[in-house]
C-alpha cells in the first residue's frame, strides 16, 4: 500500500478543470469535443473516483500521477435494467483527426485512423483525438470496472459507442462510474504515458514497464523454431539449426522451442498416447495436453546422442517434403469439410486421398529413428533435461532456452481425466463484439473442439505443474500464446474479468517461482483486459501479429505487403503496450524476399532480435549487420514510436505517407523511414488485403526535431545541441543539420527503408567539431558507441563490434589510438573520419579509442 496522503501529497492534486460535461456537450478547455452526449452519461474527475491512499504504486509514480490528475477523469453511464452486456453512446464528433487501435482478431490489434465516431472499427481499445483549437490531444481508454471490461465501437451519425460486458449471463450491472478513462495533454507521447500511469494507480491490477525487470534476452540474438520446423520440431533439427548459426559466425544467445514439443492427444484417441506426425499449424488446435512433460520426440532423447562423432544427421529436404505433404493434407481436409456440408458424392474419394497422404507423411517421418526408445542399462539421462544440457555443452553462449505453451495448456486446453487437475470440456462462446473481426483458423478450430478448462481454483497448480518441471529440465522461460481463449469460456466462472484474474494470478506466481520473475514472452494477447489484469509481473510481449512470409489467402504479392503491415502493427501498438511491457517485434527469416526490410526495423526496435530460419537457409551477411559475433546486439535504449506527422496518417494505403519511427541510442537518436504502402485493413471484407495501386515509391522528409528527445530523461539533453551530424545508413551519406535547418528530402522505394542517425556535434578547443557515428557496417550504427568522453582537445570512445568506424570531424586528427596503439586512419574533406576496428574476443568485442587534435 502507498503511504496515506499527507499535506505535501495533497498539495499535488490540482483543482483546475480541463474537461466539462454540460448541456449534452463534452468540452476540452471550453471547446466541444463530443456533441449529443446522452443524459445518462456522466463524467467525474480523477480525484473524485481514484483513492490514492489505496494504491500499491511506488511513491514516486503516485506523486507524478497526482500532479497531473486534473488532466484526467472518467466516463460512466447508467441503464434502468441490469445486463451482462450494455451499450451506450458517449457522444458524437466529426471533423477531428483520430488515431485508434482496434482488435482485428481475438488475439491481435492494429492501427486505424478517421475523422468521426462512425469511422471507428469494432473492438477499439483506445482513441486519441487531435484538438487543434487547443493545440492538444485527448485520449479515451475503455477500461475495467467491477466485473466488466469495455471497448469502443462505431455508432450511427458520428456517435462513439462504448460496450461494457461481463462475459457471463449471471453477472449483470446497470451503472458504471468509471468505465472509460479520459486524459488531456499537449504532447501525444506524454499523453499515453500519463494516461496509463493514471489507470495503473486507479486499477491497482497491473504495473508499468518502469516498475518491472525485463528478461535477459532483451539485448540478444536468438532463434525460434516455428517457421523452421512447424510441428515437426525435434532435438536433431534444433541441434543442427544452432550448429548452423555457430558455423556461420553468429552465436544465438537464446532459442525458443515453439509449438510441437508438448504431449497432446485428441478426443477419441488413446488418452495416454501422444498425437504423432503432425506437420502444419492448425492440425494441433483441437489437441489437448494430457501430461506436463515433453512429447515422445523429446522424451526419448538420450544424453550425449548429438555430441559424439556419429550424431544423427538432419535432412532439410525431408522437412521440405513433409511441408508439401502437409499442405496437400490441409487442402484435402478443407475439401472434406466442404463435401460434408454440401453432401457431395466425392466424399469417399476425398477420404481415400486423405488416408494415402497420411500414410505418405508417416513414411516421411520414418519412426523418428534417432533413438530406439529403449533406455539403456547405463546411467544415461533422457528427455528434455538431457537435451538442454547437451545444447549448453555444445553451445557455450546459449543463455536461455524458452518453450511455447498456450495459456490454457495447449490450444485445446487440458484433456479431462489425464492429469491430477479438475478439467472440464467447456463449449466456446464468442462475444458479439468479435463478429466483425477477421476470419481466423485458430478461432474456428478452438470453437469447434471446445476448450479443456482447468477449474480456476487450480490455475496455480496448472502453471506450477508445467513450469516446475520445465525449470528442472533446464528451461529458463516460456512463450505463452493463445491468451484470449479464456473469454470464450467464462460464462460459468464469474465472467471474463474474474476468470482472467485467477488465471493471471496463477501464471504470475509460477513465473516468479520458476522463471526468475520475468522469464516470459506474452503472445496473442492484444486485448485490453490482458494488459489491465495480466501485467503485474509480465514485462515483455509481442506487439504485432505473426510474421507471415506469404499470404495464406494466396495473394502472390503478400510476401511483400504483409511485411509492411507487420511494421504498422508493431509501431502503433507500442504507443500503449510499451507503457506496460517491453515491445517484442517477433521473428523473421533472414533469407526472405523482404528480409532486409525486416532487418532495418529490428535494428532499431529496442528489443531482442530473433529469426526463424530453416536449417541451412540463412543470409549471414544480413544477420551480421544486426548481431555481434557473441550474439549480443547494438540495442536502442527505448522502443520505437511513430513520428508526430505519422500519428494521424495511414502509412499503408494512403499513397503519400512513409512510416517514420524514432528511437534513442546512448549518444544520439535514430529515425527509420519505411515504405509500407501497398496493403491494409478492408472494413467491408473484414481482412487485410493488398492495395497494389499504393505499392510505389513515396517521397517524404525527415528532420532532427522529429526525434522526441524528452521522452527519456537520459536523452533529453541531446535535443538541445546547436548542430547535429546526420548519417544515412543505406545511402552512406553524411551531412550537418541544426534545429532550424530545412528537412532532408527523400524518396523511399516500395518495401525498402533508410535509417537516419542524428548525433550532437561537440565543439572542441579551436572550434574543431566532432561527433561519433559508430560502426557503419551495422544497421544501428549509433548503438555500437557504448561510451563517450571529451577530454581536453580530444575524445575517448568505447565501441563494441568490428568493422568500419565512422565519425564526423571538421579537421583531421593529429593522432588516433586504438586499444593503446597508434593506427592509420582516413580523413576526408567532407568531415568523414574512418578507421578499421577488429573484433577482439578477449575484450568481448569492445575497443578503446583515443582521438587527439
Swiss-Prot record:
This is Stachyose synthase. Keywords: Carbohydrate metabolism, Cytoplasm, Glycosyltransferase, Transferase. It is an enzyme of class 2 (transferase). It comes from Pisum sativum (Garden pea). Catalyzes stachyose synthesis by transfer of a galactosyl moiety from galactinol to raffinose. Also catalyzes verbascose synthesis by galactosyl transfer from galactinol to stachyose or from one stachyose molecule to another. Oligosaccharides of the raffinose family play a protective role in maturation drying of seeds. They may act as cryoprotectants in frost-hardy plants. The gene is STS1. Pathway: Glycan metabolism; stachyose biosynthesis; stachyose from raffinose: step 1/1. SUPFAM superfamilies: (Trans)glycosidases. One of its GO terms (biological process) is oligosaccharide biosynthetic process. Residues 1-11 form a propeptide.
